[in-house]
Swiss-Prot record:
Start-end of Basic residues biased regions: 171-181, 248-260
Description of how the protein assembles with itself and partners: Interacts with GNAS. May interact with DNAJB1.
Cited function: Regulates the expression, localization to the plasma membrane and function of the sodium chloride cotransporters SLC12A1 and SLC12A3, two key components of salt reabsorption in the distal renal tubule.
Biased composition (Polar residues): 24-37, 81-93
Protein's recorded name: Melanoma-associated antigen D2
Segments for region (Disordered): 1-204, 248-275, 534-563
Residues with PTM N-acetylserine: 2
Tissues/organs with expression: Widely expressed. In the developing and adult kidney, expressed in the thick ascending limb of the loop of Henle and the distal convoluted tubules outside the loop.
Sequence positions bearing Phosphothreonine: 72
């Protein structure tokens, strides 16, 4: 009883001193109490095992151990001395064990919850409680008068330990719930336990962070429920509020605005208003330019049109070119044709009645075009290519030799290797890997549009006085080429009509720039002759219903008197016809043989 009264007096005295001291002295006292409690001398990793050993020893010794301690005061002083000697060594170990136990709680999620390492204070409490259960008298005996100040704050340390146990238990439950979620895929249990544990993404939430999140949640839509919830659930709700700051309605509104912006960016902007009169005036200038440039029969480059005529209106050059093409068709009967999509080369083609050869030109150029038809026939009949040696073999039989000036053709070699090549009537290329170098002739791009293989075949058969079907391979190839060209022409005409309808061409806008007097324009005699030929062609088309053989003869005579060469071999083209037929007649006589063998150009000379 005396011991009990002394311990009560010591407790009263400790409380009086604690009220007078500041917080630092109280913490020092708590550290002293922790140091005076029995601490094993073994390393801190084996503290849990030592607790169980203390329990076993206390159970085995029983009352006898307590009796010995009560009888011998020296035995009471020995543990106190030992504890005081090891105070400096165990103080750091106890603090480190407490810190490591808190850090280990978050790392061991998949481990057994029962195997969580307890803090050092809890170990001491277990040993103290075990000794109390075995023998309460032994516990009272160990409380010596000298240790009374150290044992007096024991109730406060017990309260702190119980608080730590309460903080630890929900965390263990949260680990169990996360394990169940991993195995069974249950979301409700894990979310509730994570809310109870006060963790965010596997990390412990500090009190300051929870307070901040709670303040934010109090201003949000969950403020009513936040006032009725615990601190841990409040932290979880605050975390949810932070993760979803925008409501679903706000997100849907933002998605709609983004979709509307994307749709508006994809929609083509309305073109600015156009000055049709200005565009048509520039198109009329381009028509004059094209007629003047085509006199040389060299294809016209689009870059030249942009540089010389269109100039600053490069953003609307497709409409200017299309308007110029429409004016050429309606006024002159000429089609503006792009023959090379890569280099953007344009030529002018006649839409009037074609000649037998299919190539139109002035009277001065008619002999040259007659020679060109001979060359195209040789190339086509020899498989769409012919070597330069074969070409000159045929021309020598016609009296034409390289290096010798001719009265009609001038320098023949320059004509067929330079002028016809520049005009895109022929292609002149070197034979690969030839030594000494050899060259071949092919049809040029212009020849495919101004004439056709069927026309060339008929021209050759007319010279030979044969039916085109006798040349079976060439006739089949010519038929396939005509079908392909007709399909391409139909598709191109449809596309051109759609483009012109979209641009408003052909609806009277071509008169926006006012009437244009083409007779006074400096477009050259050939263009003026084309205007006259176009007028005659329209008149002939109107009289075609009542035309007869005599009318056809008079039409040919009138056409031969004009500068145009439309409507068969006219007087201007009679020289070409005479030259061509004379050449083939001489070639037939020179190349004739008793066996009826074929000549160099593939014709059978009989």
């Amino acid at each position: 009883m005396s011991d009990t009264s002394e311990s009560g007096a010591g407790l009263t005295r400790f409380q009086a001193e604690a009220s007078e001291k500041d917080s630092s002295s109280m913490m020092q006292t708590l550290l002293t109490v922790t140091q005076n409690v029995e601490v094993p001398e073994t390393p801190k990793a084996s503290k849990a095992l030592e607790v169980s050993e203390d329990v076993k020893v206390s159970k085995a010794s029983g009352v006898s151990k307590a009796t010995e301690v009560s009888k011998t005061p020296e035995a009471r002083e020995a543990p106190a001395t030992q504890a005081s000697s090891t105070t400096q060594l165990t103080d750091t170990q106890v603090l480190a064990a407490e810190n490591k136990s808190l850090a280990a709680d978050t790392k061991k999620q998949n481990a057994d919850p029962q195997a969580v390492t307890m803090p050092a204070t809890e170990t001491k409490k277990v040993s103290h409680v075990a000794d109390t259960k075995v023998n309460t008298k032994a516990q009272e005996t160990e409380a010596a008068p000298s240790q009374a100040p150290a044992d007096e704050p024991e109730p406060e340390s017990a309260a702190a330990q119980s608080q730590e146990n309460q903080d630890t238990r929900p965390k263990v439950k949260a680990k169990k719930a996360r394990k169940v979620k991993h195995l069974d895929g249950e979301e409700d249990g894990s979310s509730d336990q994570s809310q109870a544990s006060g963790t965010t993404g596997g990390r412990r939430v500090s009190k300051a962070l929870m307070a901040s999140m709670a303040r934010r949640a109090s201003r949000g839509p969950i403020a009513f429920w936040a006032r009725r919830a615990s601190r841990t659930r409040l932290a979880a709700w605050a975390r949810r509020a932070l993760l979803s700051l925008r409501s679903p309605k706000a997100r849907r509104g933002k998605a709609r605005r983004r979709a509307a912006k994307l749709q508006s960016s994809q929609e083509p902007e309305a073109p600015p208003p156009r000055d049709v009169a200005l565009l048509q005036g520039r198109a009329n200038d381009l028509v004059k330019y094209l007629l003047a440039k085509d006199q040389t029969k060299i294809p016209i480059k689009r870059s030249d049109m942009l540089k010389d005529i269109i100039k600053e209106y490069t953003d609307v050059y497709p409409e200017i070119i299309e308007r110029a093409g429409y004016s050429l068709e309606k006024v002159f009967g000429i089609q503006l044709k792009e023959i090379d999509k890569n280099d953007h080369l344009y030529i002018l083609l006649s839409t009037l009645e074609p000649t037998d050869a299919g190539i139109l030109g002035t009277t001065k150029d008619s002999p040259k075009l007659g020679l060109l038809m001979v060359l195209l026939s040789i190339i086509f009949m020899n498989g769409n290519r012919s070597s330069e040696a074969v070409i000159w073999e045929v021309l020598r039989k016609l009296g034409l030799r390289p290096g010798i000036h001719h009265s009609l053709f001038g320098d023949v070699k320059k004509l067929i290797t330079d002028e016809f090549v520049k005009q895109k009537y022929l292609d002149y290329a070197r034979v690969p890997n030839s030594n000494p170098p050899e060259y071949e002739f092919f049809w040029g791009l212009r020849s495919y549009y101004e004439t056709s293989k069927m026309k060339v075949l008929k021209f050759a058969c007319k010279v030979q006085k044969k039916d085109p079907k006798e040349w079976a391979a060439q006739y089949r190839e010519a038929m396939e080429a005509d079908l392909k060209a007709a399909a391409e022409a139909a598709a191109e005409a449809k596309a051109r009509a759609e483009i012109r309808a979209r641009m408003g061409i052909g609806l009277g806008s071509e008169n926006a720039a006012g009437p244009c007097n083409w007779d006074e324009a400096d477009i050259g005699p050939w263009a003026k002759a084309r205007i006259q030929a176009g007028a005659e062609a329209k008149a002939k088309a109107q009289e075609s219903g009542s035309a007869s053989t005599g009318a056809s003869t008079s039409t040919n005579n009138s056409a031969s008197a004009s500068a145009s060469t439309s409507g068969g071999f006219s007087a201007g083209a009679s020289l070409t016809a005479t030259l061509t037929f004379g050449l083939f007649a001489g070639l037939g006589g020179a190349g004739a043989s008793t066996s009826g063998s074929s000549g160099a150009c593939g014709f059978s000379y009989k």
